[in-house]
Amino acid sequence: MAVNPFKPTAGKMPPILIGRHSIIEDFSEALTNGVGAPGRIMLVTGQRGFGKTVMLTEFRRIAKAQHWEVIGETASAGLVTRLIAALSPSGLRLDQANISPSIGISGIATASLGQAYFSAESNPLTLRNALNKRLGSKKLGKGKGILITIDETQAASHDDLVAIATAVQHVITDADESDTPDEDKKGVAIVFAGLPYMVNDLLDNEVTTFLRRALRRELDNVPLPDVKNAFLETVADSGKTISGEDALEAARQSEGYPYMVQLVGYYMWQSAQRRGSDVITADDVSTGVSDALLAFDDAVC
């Protein structure tokens, strides 16, 4: 049974990433070019439905393919505590964490700006030395590192962002102070993603310097020729066909808005499928656009 190839679900990888080649190259090249490459600290912004979460998923896929370790997080209370736990030896237990300028972890630890001092069984552990410990692992090859992605950055607390910025800057400095050749140094890459106007608000505090030094990329509408070609390729790969003219009309109706591209594609494909046809016609495109608009209104209103 044929399966609809279009995926208009939040955060779901589409069959083809369109119009994002430049940002993907920025990131991939940064991993290759070593510690200090601009793309190793990146801020990705865009309106809802523009594919920020999908971009982070793709970055993690790229990093894994290059034998990096990856940690994917979404900003919410306890972000720094979760990062420390993810970087720490298995079995390390964090209970009742409260991330603020002064952190208390009842019965286990106290912390400040991302520092967490654990009880007798472990050495004092901070986000900085948790990163350094993990980077020192023999499991990581020369020139590799740890990628951290943080989605919905606009929801991050001020103190979490200060803790992360401070830790990452120190880890970069620590690497500089080692005698290891640059091409062999293990490093950290971090990518933040969030809404433009809310992220702008975050730039007006103590993390301004760190985030402003980040390579900033804003996701925008996808060019219509790219959308048309994606429709042609995706439909063909699914076992159906669509004319160039109808694919262009579907692209125009989507206006290059990534979420709408997936909606239009999904419903026009489904229209043909319901007819038992392997050909997506102009009528299927029209039906698909109408259904997509209804679904879009339900999703955003």
Which role does the model predict for each range below?
Residues 65, 70, 80-113:
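Conserved NTP-binding/hydrolysis module of P-loop NTPases
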Residues 1-42, 86-89, 173-184:
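A short, basic N-terminal segment
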Residues 38-58:
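Walker A/P-loop nucleotide-binding motif
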Residues 117-197, 205-207:
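Conserved Walker B catalytic segment
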Residues 252, 256, 260-301:
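Winged-helix-like regulatory helical subdomains adjacent to P-loop NTPase cores
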Residues 204-220:
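A short helix-turn-beta junction within AAA+ P-loop NTPase domains corresponding to the substrate/partner-engaging
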Residues 43, 57-79, 146:
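Conserved catalytic segments around the Walker B and adjacent sensor/switch elements
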Residues 219-246, 264:
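Conserved small helical "lid"/interfacial subdomain of P-loop NTPases
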